[in-house]
From Swiss-Prot:
GO CC field: large ribosomal subunit
Function: Forms part of the ribosomal stalk, playing a central role in the interaction of the ribosome with GTP-bound translation factors.
A family per Pfam: Ribosomal_L10
Similarity-based family: Belongs to the universal ribosomal protein uL10 family.
UniProt cross-references to Gene3D superfamilies, sorted A to Z: 3.30.70.1730, 6.10.250.290
PROSITE patterns in the record: RIBOSOMAL_L10 (PS01109)
Record's protein name: Large ribosomal subunit protein uL10
Gene Ontology terms describing biological process: translation
Classification of source organism: Bacteria, Bacillati, Cyanobacteriota, Cyanophyceae, Synechococcales
Length: 187
């Protein structure tokens, strides 16, 4: 009988580890005061942004991140009742979903976030949330690259044209200079 709870805890740690490995960012929130229906509502909103909200005991989360440096940023936020929002997909969309939920219910408290081994504050997470979606950023980068390529092509195309104009201008300039010298000597 004593091994059964340990086996469940080990299974839970493994599940959390696999979710963390698939995640890009983790938000840590205090969920005190949320009803079951509100928690289910939050989970449903987060699912749309490819994020998962889990309530995990802090000791189990410590075990799950113990050997993963990428998630060491979570450790400072592990105190009291804690829920973890593991974002696998669109980070700005998931952060916005959480922020909208928090504004609506006024019952959750954002403790912090972690990504790439760093701890993030609310302001840092909000700055990320205000970024355009991934597809828009990719389109902007592609547009910038296309613009650079176009400018380069136009510039390279202009060089031979300008060289040709310069070559054509040499005889005309030489003729004007000779005419000016002749006019000066005649005067």
């Amino acid at each position: 009988m004593g091994k059964q709870p340990l086996a469940k805890k080990a299974e839970m740690v493994d599940e959390v580890r696999s979710l963390l490995q698939a995640s890009q960012m983790v938000l840590v929130i205090d969920y005190r005061g949320l009803t079951v229906s509100e928690m289910n509502q939050l989970r449903a909103e987060l699912r749309k942004a490819d994020a998962v909200c889990m309530v995990v005991k802090n000791t189990l989360m410590r075990r799950a991140v113990a050997d993963q440096k990428a998630w060491a940023g979570i450790l400072p936020f592990l105190s009291g009742p804690t829920a973890f929002i593991m974002i696998r997909g669109d980070i700005p969309a998931a952060l916005k979903a959480y922020q909208d939920f928090a504004k609506q219910t006024k019952k959750t408290e954002f403790r912090g976030a972690a990504a790439e081994g760093l701890s993030l504050t609310l302001d840092q997470a909000k700055a990320i949330a205000e970024l355009p979606p991934k597809e828009v950023l990719m389109a902007q980068v592609a547009g910038s690259l296309k613009s650079v390529a176009t400018r380069l092509a136009v510039g390279l195309n202009a060089v031979p044209t300008q060289v040709a104009r310069g070559i054509q201008e040499i005889p005309a300039s030489l003729a004007r200079a000779i005419r000016a010298i002749a006019d000066k000597e005649a005067a």
